[in-house]
């Protein structure tokens, strides 16, 4: 009986640690504007961003809270000098459109960057004329 109790407690600890580790790679953001992701315009709304496989940190899932829209996002690794202070999405704003550009998780020095955040046809001079918009995750 004591052995079963100890095994149950250990199992609960493992599950709790697993859930805590997963939550570091999952967060919600309320996006107040339409945005472009991989050439498709997505509506404003509440989104969940998550890394579904820790072994593949460059593959993210972006979905609306109601799961009506689900997108698999293949990204490139990007780094910064200081850890991220909050989970967030970075958008490039250009000519009235917002393009999902980067995804950062709290306390991480490595983020995810969408390779073709801008139209491929845009020349280099236009690419330099952009504004960055950051949306922080809900606490």
Regions found by a protein language model. Give the residues of each.
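Beta-strand-rich cores of mature extracytoplasmic or soluble domains
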Residues: 75-139
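Bacterial N-terminal signal peptides
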Residues: 6-16
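A short tyrosine-centered beta-strand micro-motif
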Residues: 45-49
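Mature extracytoplasmic domains of secretory-pathway proteins
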Residues: 57, 61-85
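Positively charged n-region of N-terminal signal peptides that target proteins for export
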Residues: 1-4
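Sec/Tat signal peptide C-region and signal peptidase I cleavage site
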Residues: 17-21
